[in-house]
Amino acid sequence: MGNTFGRLFRVSTFGESHGGGVGVVIDGCPPRLEISQEEIQIDLDRRKPGQSRIVTPRRENDICEIISGVFDGKTLGTPIAILVRNQDARSQDYNEMAEKFRPSHADATYEAKYGIRNWKGGGRSSARETIGRVAAGAIAKKILKSVYNVEIIGYVKRIKDLEAIIDPNTVTLDEVESNIVRCPNGETAAKMIALIDQIRLDKDSIGGVVECVARNVPKGLGEPVFDKLEADLAKGMMSLPASKGFEIGSGFAGTFLTGSEHNDEYFIDNNGEIRTTSNRSGGIQGGISNGENIIIRTAFKPTATIGKEQKTVTRSGEETTLAAKGRHDPCVLPRAVPMVEAMMALVLCDHLLRFQGQCTISDRFF
């Protein structure tokens, strides 16, 4: 249970960190969409381990194989299956964790729930599960781009106490990809990289915040009450490994303002469209997109698996210590950027199909 996301654009991920491979089955993708392995690979390469000195040194090519659902470079409308094979698992590094629980990791809770767990690499709780999401997200991005020219860009906003000043309305993908930490502010990025280098040498970890903007999102996506667009975005982001917080628009900072200070006042633009003079709502009002840029932030905790010795317990209830071995990210933020983008794309694509199914058909009634 809990391995499927979405209502009409449905993705089901599978696989474990040290198993034969990981992947995704996508159901509900419209037919005749032009898509290639190379397009999907672009985002997978941004997510893969071993890409720089500030991420896990595990070496995986993460080459995707499209198993079904695509023919002659176009989607068939049938389920799309994508597989990425694991090649560089070193399960012996985890032998100690077969008995000892890693503090703040999923080891103890998986054991409590199922009575059994795959301790090699964390199994399903590993961030390798997100390979399937990123692959599906690449297809969702293509749909959104093809229909409404929607552009989704994520970037590292903050690491520990180093926060970058970034304009989400103008930031570009080239700026994000200009350095290994994926912070488009070069001066702050250099400080972030130096901090991660030091944390890695200390055998410790740090967290931070990924901000993500979706531009050109049409009005009308999202549904009242339980399926509000921001509610589904929050679910998507909070389902990512290591995520601990979600904000949209003004977020928690908005609680310091009065209503007159916080409200986004309306005006009519040169095209006769209703617009807002500010965007503290983050592009969503009443759970429905208003046509402004959707701006969200996701907080990620410090990586739980660290080389520093910490107190823990064994499966049999004995107190002990653990200094984790294995290859792990000292900071998940650089590789979390494409994961956040993917979840944004999956939510928007699913709601776009729902909007088309419910609201555009009514045009035929009049």
From Swiss-Prot:
Enzyme superclass (EC): lyase
Keyword Amino-acid biosynthesis: yes
HAMAP family: Chorismate_synth
Pathway: Metabolic intermediate biosynthesis; chorismate biosynthesis; chorismate from D-erythrose 4-phosphate and phosphoenolpyruvate: step 7/7
Alphabetized PROSITE patterns for the sequence: CHORISMATE_SYNTHASE_1, CHORISMATE_SYNTHASE_2, CHORISMATE_SYNTHASE_3
Biological classification of the source: Bacteria, Bacillati, Cyanobacteriota, Cyanophyceae, Oscillatoriophycideae
E.C. designation(s): 4.2.3.5
InterPro entries xrefs: Chorismate_synth, Chorismate_synth_AroC_sf, Chorismate_synthase_CS
Name listed for the protein in its UniProt record: Chorismate synthase
Gene behind this protein: aroC
Reaction(s) catalysed (UniProt annotation): 5-O-(1-carboxyvinyl)-3-phosphoshikimate = chorismate + phosphate
Family, per entry: Belongs to the chorismate synthase family.
GO cellular component: cytosol
Xref: Pfam families: Chorismate_synt (PF01264)
Subunit field text: Homotetramer.
Keyword Flavoprotein: yes
Domain of life where this protein originates: Bacteria
Cofactor binding: number and manner: Reduced FMN (FMNH(2)).
Binding site for NADP(+): 47, 53
One term of GO molecular function: chorismate synthase activity
GO terms under biological process: amino acid biosynthetic process; aromatic amino acid family biosynthetic process; chorismate biosynthetic process
Function: This reaction introduces a second double bond into the aromatic ring system.
Residue numbers binding FMN: 124-126, 286, 301-305, 327
Protein species of origin: Microcystis aeruginosa (strain NIES-843 / IAM M-2473)
